[in-house]
Swiss-Prot record:
Organism expressing this protein natively: Rattus norvegicus
Organism phylogeny: Eukaryota, Metazoa, Chordata, Craniata, Vertebrata
Quaternary structure note: Homodimer; disulfide-linked. Can also form heterodimer with VEGF.
Chain ranges passing through the membrane: none
GO terms under cellular component: extracellular region; extracellular space; membrane
Pfam family, any one: PDGF
Function: Growth factor for endothelial cells. VEGF-B167 binds heparin and neuropilin-1 whereas the binding to neuropilin-1 of VEGF-B186 is regulated by proteolysis.
Start and end residues of each stretch annotated as Disordered: 140-182
Protein name as it appears in the record: Vascular endothelial growth factor B
Keywords: Disulfide bond, Growth factor, Heparin-binding, Mitogen, Secreted, Signal
Family: Belongs to the PDGF/VEGF growth factor family.
Amino acid sequence: MSPLLRRLLLVALLQLACTQAPVSQFDGPSHQKKVVSWIDVYARATCQPREVVVPLSMELMGNVVKQLVPSCVTVQRCGGCCPDDGLECVPIGQHQVRMQILMIQYPSSQLGEMSLEEHSQCECRPKRKESAVKPDRVAIPHHRPQPRSVLSWDSAPGASSPADIIHPTPAPGPSAHAAPSAVSALIPGPAVAAADAAASSIAKGGA
């Protein structure tokens, strides 16, 4: 559908929605219900930031070592319909919002701060087409998916946090370039062996 035809259709529908009175599903006075107008339905369905509920485990991509309360939060994310099937609703503006989350690990609990991504502007853009991968080549991802949220700790003074736990570094093993042992130092090299052979031959000739 061309953009001009789409605009003409939208104008015609707007005029029809303004001139036509809404008709209730039930004619009886006891069953009268409010009918949402077409313009309101269209406005609610457009691509825009809207409040959604997201699980924190999904935001952190499974990097959760403690129980989080609450286990899900509400954030503003892009969503809605686009006028063409070849378009998708994507964010063109985002920012970070910090929230306090209670982290529980028996027998203690502490408050932490979580930085979550929120969308402020959305737009319908062409869908990304996946590039064809040749069977004799292995597809290598350009980037590794990163979590949308970052969890930081706000512990009480003196309390240890995961960032404070230092894992001991294993003791270095024997080096591959270690000095030769005493046994190997006693074994004559090729030059020493040649000199000994020459000295033996001279001694035999003199005898």
